[in-house]
Amino acid sequence: MKSLLVVMLALLLASPVSYALTLDEARAQGRVGETFTGYLAPVAQDGETAALVARINQARAESYRDVAQQNGLPVDEVAKMAGQKLVARSKPGEYVRGINGQLMKK
């Protein structure tokens, strides 16, 4: 069951998304940061970044719900597992939210 969950999370996290501002661009520009909750946090306070964060977080929430239902797990547990992977996979110079709650460069 855990291996299925890991595979599904990997597919979720690797799926390409096309927006005016892409997630990769936003990360590279320091406009968003990953969190241990599994959701993006805005670093920049502009409309384009806010819209991207809202879209990505909504899609993630739906995916986390699907994975949780398929594996009989709480949604927040699935989200936290994904968040740990996303923070760990963040590149040097990208923002992540630390355990102190502050967004900082990795």
Label for each model-derived stretch:
Residues 14-18:
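N-terminal signal peptide c-region/cleavage motif recognized by signal peptidases
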Residues 2, 19-106:
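Anionic, Ser/Thr-rich low-complexity intrinsically disordered regions
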Residues 2-8:
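Sec-dependent signal peptide recognition
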